[in-house]
UniProtKB/Swiss-Prot annotation:
<dbReference type="InterPro" id="IPR053905">
    <property type="entry name" value="EF-G-like_DII"/>
</dbReference>
<dbReference type="InterPro" id="IPR038467">
    <property type="entry name" value="RF3_dom_3_sf"/>
</dbReference>
<dbReference type="GO" id="GO:0016150">
    <property type="term" value="F:translation release factor activity, codon nonspecific"/>
</dbReference>
<dbReference type="InterPro" id="IPR032090">
    <property type="entry name" value="RF3_C"/>
</dbReference>
<dbReference type="GO" id="GO:0097216">
    <property type="term" value="F:guanosine tetraphosphate binding"/>
</dbReference>
<dbReference type="InterPro" id="IPR027417">
    <property type="entry name" value="P-loop_NTPase"/>
</dbReference>
<feature type="domain" description="tr-type G">
    <location>
        <begin position="11"/>
        <end position="277"/>
    </location>
</feature>
<feature type="binding site">
    <location>
        <begin position="142"/>
        <end position="145"/>
    </location>
    <ligand>
        <name>GTP</name>
    </ligand>
</feature>
<dbReference type="Pfam" id="PF22042">
    <property type="entry name" value="EF-G_D2"/>
</dbReference>
<dbReference type="Pfam" id="PF16658">
    <property type="entry name" value="RF3_C"/>
</dbReference>
<comment type="function">
    <text>Increases the formation of ribosomal termination complexes and stimulates activities of RF-1 and RF-2. It binds guanine nucleotides and has strong preference for UGA stop codons. It may interact directly with the ribosome. The stimulation of RF-1 and RF-2 is significantly reduced by GTP and GDP, but not by GMP.</text>
</comment>
<keyword id="KW-0547">Nucleotide-binding</keyword>
<comment type="similarity">
    <text>Belongs to the TRAFAC class translation factor GTPase superfamily. Classic translation factor GTPase family. PrfC subfamily.</text>
</comment>
<dbReference type="InterPro" id="IPR035647">
    <property type="entry name" value="EFG_III/V"/>
</dbReference>
<dbReference type="GO" id="GO:0016149">
    <property type="term" value="F:translation release factor activity, codon specific"/>
</dbReference>
<feature type="binding site">
    <location>
        <begin position="88"/>
        <end position="92"/>
    </location>
    <ligand>
        <name>GTP</name>
    </ligand>
</feature>
<keyword id="KW-0963">Cytoplasm</keyword>
């Protein structure tokens, strides 16, 4: 039954991801958000191996051992009567392509930048993906209580490299050991950092008159007044329409570890981040207000529960609503199924649900039939688009210490590839198994998970591959000639799509120039 309060439920939801370079403080921010949402009583802190205390959002064994986030956790919490769906992406140096795909399931992104380092490599790559859909971006410049770069310099870098117009919402009062707080330009309030006074904020009147000297000292008071006058004259005021179009980004400053500025972020998500947005299908636009249910799979996680060796499919609801026991059509395989055991998440903990709405992420038990990119509807034959596979950047040849376990190896690799950990390629000329990943750490993850979850010992050999491009060709004669001339460089991926594995960029350029009627693509639609 379709709820009469559907529109109200939509307005109460925000679905967003946090993205950053390693060590920018993303996990700490996630923990503090859960703390503000009263999901956890004490925020966890990342500790070294063997400490026994880990962040709530890091729940896989390898994450706990290394103190890093490898998978993408999905967490739901309530803040000021708004239901927040937070997709926490990996913050370690090597992402999987799963990280990129997560951004297709959110309506807004929070970018975390280290105040001492500015924009770093992984932030750039994630932003490139977010910009494909013009996803609204909120920026948090973290670690102001440590030595940091000049704030204006960081804003200039954001505008130049990320092509976003910066709109400062808060502004730091000094930094490092002298960090005293921020002036909230939009609310016209000064928030003091670890104030020794009874009040932890000052009104605008206090900012303008001489009483500010009591809190900051005469010299700092004069300096911050002059700096703020400059900032408010140089930068534009916040415009929600431009933010929602991905043109501008509101800028916040603070210290996640010091629990300072996180509430400002959450308040901005409530006020400015969009409620669930529409999605494009192969036939039409699907709006969240529609009565009929639709959703798509953006992630699969194998063996979340080692006791049950299960696989979970993560579904973003696009329209309609989920009700326990409803019948859905799995469009790709043209099969109707009854969903009675969907659940929501809290960093690995499953909570059975009776209802869910657009913007929510629900988990479905998967026995091998659900794949990334699959669409579920109430009968309409559509497929959501814009959920791609990305060409890997690093490659390895995998082989077994015990050749008799080849069958188990293939099964394990299929599961790991379906959840986006790595991609698996089968050369057309031999039985080798070549793995491709976005970052080197994913290979360590595969070896460890094969050992723990499948009792398989495998090792790697280096392979002479530097680039991969999927082949798209409508001319059978041209495709035949390509296979004949370059068979040693061709392979099939897990979906049996043909891919060219190039030993160098020069090699790829030559092949492309000689086969102008064939497309060599860095992404492939699921």
């Amino acid at each position: 039954m379709f709820d009469s309060n559907h529109e109200q439920e939509l307005s109460k939801r925000r679905t967003f991801a946090i993205i950053s370079h390693p060590d920018a403080g993303k996990t700490t921010i996630t923990e503090k958000m859960l703390f503000f949402g009263k999901v956890i009583r004490v925020p966890g802190t990342i500790k070294g191996r063997g400490s026994g205390k880990y962040a709530k959002s890091d729940w896989m064994n390898i994450e706990k051992e290394r103190g890093i986030s490898i998978t993408t956790s999905v967490m739901q919490f309530t803040y000021k009567n708004i239901l927040m769906n937070l997709l926490d992406t990996p913050g370690h140096q090597d992402f999987s392509e799963d990280t990129y795909r997560i951004l297709t399931a959110v309506d807004c992104c929070l970018v975390v930048i280290d105040a001492a380092k500015g924009i770093e490599e992984r932030t750039r790559k994630l932003m490139d993906v977010a910009r494909i859909h013009n996803t609204p971006i909120i920026t948090f410049i973290n670690k102001l209580d440590r030595d940091s770069r000049d704030p204006i310099e960081i804003l200039d870098e954001i505008e130049k490299e990320l092509k976003l117009h910066c709109i400062p919402i808060s502004w730091p009062i000094s930094c490092g050991k002298n960090f005293r707080g921020v002036y909230h330009i939009h609310d016209k309030i000064i928030h003091l950092y670890k104030s020794k006074f009874r009040k932890n904020f000052l009104t605008l009147d206090s900012f303008l008159d001489g009483s500010l000297n009591e809190y900051l000292g005469a010299d700092l008071s004069i300096y911050i007044r002059q700096e703020l006058e400059l900032i408010m004259n140089v930068y534009s005021k916040f415009n929600k329409e431009k933010f929602l179009k991905g043109i501008t980004t509101p800028i916040f400053f603070g210290s996640a570890l010091g629990n300072f500025g996180i509430d400002h972020l959450l308040d901005s998500l409530i006020k400015w981040a969009p409620s669930p947005l529409y999605r494009q299908s192969n036939k039409r636009i699907i709006k969240p207000q529609e009565r009929n249910f639709t959703g798509f799979i953006f992630k699969i996680q194998a063996n979340m529960d080692l006791k049950h060796r299960d696989r979970i499919a993560f579904m973003r609801i696009v329209s309609g609503q989920y009700t326990k026991g409803m019948k859905l059509t799995h469009v790709r395989i043209k099969k109707n199924i009854i969903i009675s055991d969907a659940f929501s998440f809290l960093a690995g903990e499953r909570i059975s649900i009776n209802k869910a709405y657009p913007g929510d992420v629900i988990g479905l038990h998967n026995h091998g039939t659900i794949k990334i990119g699959d669409t579920f509807t109430q009968g309409e034959e559509i497929k959501f688009i814009g959920i791609p596979s990305f060409a890997p950047e690093i490659f390895r040849l995998i082989y077994l210490k015990n050749p008799l376990k080849q069958k188990q190896l293939k099964k394990g690799l299929v599961q790991l590839s379906e959840e986006g950990t790595v991609q698996v390629f089968r050369p057309i000329l031999n039985n080798d198994l070549i793995l491709g990943a976005i970052g080197i750490l994913q290979f360590d993850v595969v070896i460890e998970r094969l050992r723990i979850e499948y009792n398989i010992d495998a090792v790697y050999k280096k392979v002479n591959i530097v680039l991969a491009r999927w082949i798209n060709c409508g001319n059978h004669h041209s495709l035949y000639n390509l296979k004949k001339s370059y068979s040693s460089y061709l392979a099939y991926d897990i979906s049996n799509s043909l891919i060219y594995l190039a030993p160098s960029s020069a090699n790829l350029n030559i092949v492309m120039s000689q086969n102008s009627d064939i497309s060599f693509n860095a992404t492939r639609e699921q």
